Amino acid sequence: MPLNVSFANRNYDLDYDSVQPYFYCDEEENFYHQQQQSELQPPAPSEDIWKKFELLPTPPLSPSRRSGLCSPSYVAVASFSPRGDDDGGGGSFSSADRLEMVTELLGGDMVNQSFICDPDDETLIKNIIIQDCMWSGFSAAAKLVSEKLASYQAARKDGGSPSPARGHGGCSTSSLYLQDLSAAASECIDPSVVFPYPLNDSSSPKPCASPDSTAFSPSSDSLLSSAESSPRASPEPLALHEETPPTTSSDSEEEQEDEEEIDVVSVEKRQPPAKRSESGSPSAGSHSKPPHSPLVLKRCHVSTHQHNYAAPPSTRKDYPAAKRAKLDSGRVLKQISNNRKCASPRSSDTEENDKRRTHNVLERQRRNELKRSFFALRDQIPELENNEKAPKVVILKKATAYILSVQAEEQKLISEKDVLRKRREQLKLKLEQIRNSCA
């Protein structure tokens, strides 16, 4: 909803109290130049960062967001003369009007926003972006406004003609400058588009610059990279670097220096303390890469006590088959239990090694089971019962021969059983005949 408040309903006392430390109206002679070179001016962004917190005991008030920016009195501020002469029409304003216009200049839209807008449109809400990210933003804006107005007045004085024609030339120059400002106002960014998420959210999208900020993009990239690598970056939300108004070619170098002096601390990013780099200047920080925090993967050592089958046989004491089978089974169970104890996060290589190790353990367990089966078969063969070093082939051959012999003996016993059964039947019949003859 646009703010439609007339210029006459403003509270001058409230506006003057909010910015009183920055103005000295007793000295109207060369006002902007004295304010720029005053000793009481807040420190520039290039100085020590901690001196900026000595600006005021409490944070300054947020800039006024009223429709007075669109008033005709405010439009005439581009041709405002600090000397109070009739060159730019400044003599028609009272001291209160001058104070109000300077207040709106220094505390309004941080210089880079447009000074001219239509009160009937909704562009006033769009071109006002949230201010006061840090205290130093206000002092940087005041210094930049003072330098711009001083350079603009110097350009007007140098390029002027005789007194009647000079006023006309000044009006045309100011109209061109105001036209550029109004063109920039139409391309301002909507705060709802720039800030779709809260500012304290670390995952909020970064603001996109408008087409007017092509000259500012290289320095903004360097400032962003230097702010990410600055050791003094505090864990605060990412602040928006605003754009500067279009200026003439006479003060392009000065504007570039001002852009390089923009406070680096206002662009901040959450960083772990251990990952902060030690770069001290924006030029050195522009070549640095943002620190990454990859997942720390810890390797877990698993002792499996693998047996080397290629090694020569050791001269250890041979245990009995039953005891050796128990030892082998216990060793396999111990290896599996040790393998399951590793529960820390692993990389892909570690997982592959663990899978291979588990496969080897299972394969070894299968071989041990097969070996125990051979040992049991060897114990059943009479010829190899006490032979601990009998090969598997011999065990298989002897077992086959023994099975055949046992089967032959079984057939022999079966035939003998049949003969005995027949003999029994014959004896039963003979006994029955004897009983019948005796009766």
UniProtKB/Swiss-Prot annotation:
GO CC terms on record?
chromatin; cytoplasm; Myc-Max complex; nuclear body; nucleolus; nucleoplasm; nucleus; RNA polymerase II transcription repressor complex
Compositional bias of kind Basic and acidic residues: 266-278, 315-331
Ranges where the record places region Leucine-zipper? 413-434
Carbohydrate attachment residues:
T58
Q: Where Phosphoserine occurs along the chain? A: S6, S62, S71, S81, S151, S161, S293, S314, S329, S344, S347, S348
Q: Where, per the database record, does this protein carry Phosphothreonine?
A: T58, T315
The UniProt annotation puts motif 9aaTAD at 100-108
What's noted about post-translational modification? Phosphorylated by PRKDC. Phosphorylation at Ser-329 by PIM2 leads to the stabilization of MYC. Phosphorylation at Ser-62 by CDK2 prevents Ras-induced senescence. Phosphorylated at Ser-62 by DYRK2; this primes the protein for subsequent phosphorylation by GSK3B at Thr-58. Phosphorylation at Thr-58 and Ser-62 by GSK3 is required for ubiquitination and degradation by the proteasome. Dephosphorylation at multiple sites by the PNUTS-PP1 complex promotes MYC stability by preventing ubiquitination by the SCF(FBXW7) complex. Ubiquitinated by the SCF(FBXW7) complex when phosphorylated at Thr-58 and Ser-62, leading to its degradation by the proteasome. Ubiquitination is counteracted by USP28 in the nucleoplasm and USP36 in the nucleolus, both interacting with of FBXW7, leading to its deubiquitination and preventing degradation. Also polyubiquitinated by the DCX(TRPC4AP) complex. Ubiquitinated by UBR5 when not forming a heterodimer with another bHLH protein, leading to its degradation: UBR5 recognizes and binds a degron that is only available upon heterodimer dissociation.
- Polar residues bias located where? 335-347
* Disordered, as annotated region: 201-359
Give the position of the cross-link Glycyl lysine isopeptide (Lys-Gly) (interchain with G-Cter in SUMO2): K52, K143, K148, K298
Q: Indicate, by first and last residue, each region the UniProt record lists as having compositional bias (Acidic residues).
A: 251-263
Q: Which GO terms describe its molecular function?
A: core promoter sequence-specific DNA binding; DNA binding; DNA-binding transcription activator activity, RNA polymerase II-specific; DNA-binding transcription factor activity, RNA polymerase II-specific; DNA-binding transcription factor binding; DNA-binding transcription repressor activity, RNA polymerase II-specific; E-box binding; identical protein binding
Q: Which Pfam families match?
A: HLH (PF00010), Myc-LZ (PF02344), Myc_N (PF01056)
Sequence positions bearing N6-acetyllysine:
K143, K148, K157, K275, K317, K323, K371
Cross-referenced InterPro entries: bHLH_dom, HLH_DNA-bd_sf, Myc-LZ, Myc_transcription_factors, Tscrpt_reg_Myc, Tscrpt_reg_Myc_N
Gene3D superfamilies reported for this sequence = Helix-loop-helix DNA-binding domain
Q: What is known of its domains?
A: The 9aaTAD motif is a transactivation domain present in a large number of yeast and animal transcription factors.
The protein's role, per its UniProt record: Transcription factor that binds DNA in a non-specific manner, yet also specifically recognizes the core sequence 5'-CAC[GA]TG-3'. Activates the transcription of growth-related genes. Binds to the VEGFA promoter, promoting VEGFA production and subsequent sprouting angiogenesis. Regulator of somatic reprogramming, controls self-renewal of embryonic stem cells. Functions with TAF6L to activate target gene expression through RNA polymerase II pause release.
Q: Per its record, how is this protein called by name?
A: Myc proto-oncogene protein
Source species of the chain: Ovis aries (Sheep)
Question: What are the leading ranks of the lineage?
Answer: Eukaryota, Metazoa, Chordata, Craniata, Vertebrata
